[in-house]
């Protein structure tokens, strides 16, 4: 018995020594002291650490929206701050939400937007400007020509908009002035004060290019996009407008005009791009004298010759000017000046059917009556939209519901024409907000 007890004790001792040896070997392989955080817990902290904010460099990230960052990008590929080429400055000006301030955008890259508002056009004008600010990227300067009685209210309303929007534009208020002829006669020509647009090249002498719109215009995509059409001008073109009608044989000018007009159907001046520098420097052919005349010196004699024959005021005068100078006009598609005439007799704007409406022109007073409820629904949706709300939830979805109530009208039967561009614009704005402000996952 004693021998067996000794053998058992020796066996237990040997097992204890072997166990100690194994524990010692394991300790050498894993020297982490107790209490050190486990590696799997530390790794996500490194993976999701905030990316240092760098000044944007557009030429290093063309088309960055929707693109994933590469895994473990080498430091040498990071964009260097403060070295953008001159060609990339325009891209910097166009991107909303960038860390770079809009105030640093060079003035020559600003969009200049002009409007003339008299009488009861205050609300319409503010809604138009709101649509421009909601969707556009580049900084804008608003040139608002209005009566003295309306100036304080314009200034008050625009300054009440949120800072996130007011930083995107500056506004200037101008009196209604006509440099030649009888001011009262010009003021009463067609709509109140509309003839003011004819004198913009002489008044805005420090502005190179300009987009003029009527008060009843709404932008359904960034103003930047129509501004780009200036680049498509050839060496002789100095203004751009859309046709008055897409089907000449049923158009107004081709059937009723008693004066010369551009092309086969005339042009509509409710949305008008102008290269003011070229207009100021051009001698225009005319029906008054054999020699060319400068823009400003041509206006009064032209009006005096044709005033008994014109119906649509300043628009008729513009048609007469470009009848004699067709090489000076660039004609853009009807989607950039979409009016009730394009759908109330059946859809006849093919570009809008393909691309969607880009600029809506609610002439005939359709924003304020029940004749074209589709146009009125869009106007009210933008007018009533709270600036800081979600565009989809507070504008787009309610707009879809309103359109269901307009299907009994010819314009209401094609809701996709009205919604296509505004949906694309909202989606793009949402994606840019997420990518720029939230940032892509750098390790995904």
Swiss-Prot record:
Q: What is its EC number?
A: 2.4.2.42
Keyword tRNA-binding in the entry? The reply is no
Q: Which CDD domains match?
A: GT8_like_2
Alphabetically, the GO molecular function entries are: UDP-D-xylose:beta-D-glucoside alpha-1,3-D-xylosyltransferase activity; UDP-xylosyltransferase activity
Which parts of the chain does the record assign to the membrane side Lumenal? 26-444
- Top enzyme class, one word, equals transferase
* Residue span of region Disordered: 31-101
Task: Enumerate the Cytoplasmic topological stretches.
Answer: 1-4
Subcellular location, record wording: Membrane
> Per the record, what is one GO cellular component?
membrane
Keywords, A to Z, come to:
Glycoprotein, Glycosyltransferase, Membrane, Signal-anchor, Transferase, Transmembrane, Transmembrane helix
A single GO BP term for this record reads: O-glycan processing
Q: Please give one Pfam family short name.
A: Glyco_transf_8
Q: Where is the composition biased (Basic and acidic residues)?
A: 87-101
| Residues that span the membrane, as ranges | 5-25
Spell out the Basic residues composition-biased ranges: 68-83
Q: Which residues are glycosylated?
A: 275
User: What InterPro entries does the entry give?
Assistant: Glyco_trans_8, Glycosyltransferase_8, Nucleotide-diphossugar_trans
- Describe its membrane topology: Single-pass type II membrane protein
Task: Tell me what reaction this enzyme catalyses.
Answer: 3-O-(beta-D-glucosyl)-L-seryl-[EGF-like domain protein] + UDP-alpha-D-xylose = 3-O-[alpha-D-xylosyl-(1->3)-beta-D-glucosyl]-L-seryl-[EGF-like domain protein] + UDP + H(+)
What the record says about family reads: Belongs to the glycosyltransferase 8 family.
Function comment: Glycosyltransferase which elongates the O-linked glucose attached to EGF-like repeats in the extracellular domain of Notch proteins by catalyzing the addition of xylose.
Protein's name in the database: Glucoside xylosyltransferase 2
State the organism named in the record.
Mus musculus (Mouse)
Instruction: Name the lineage.
Output: Eukaryota, Metazoa, Chordata, Craniata, Vertebrata
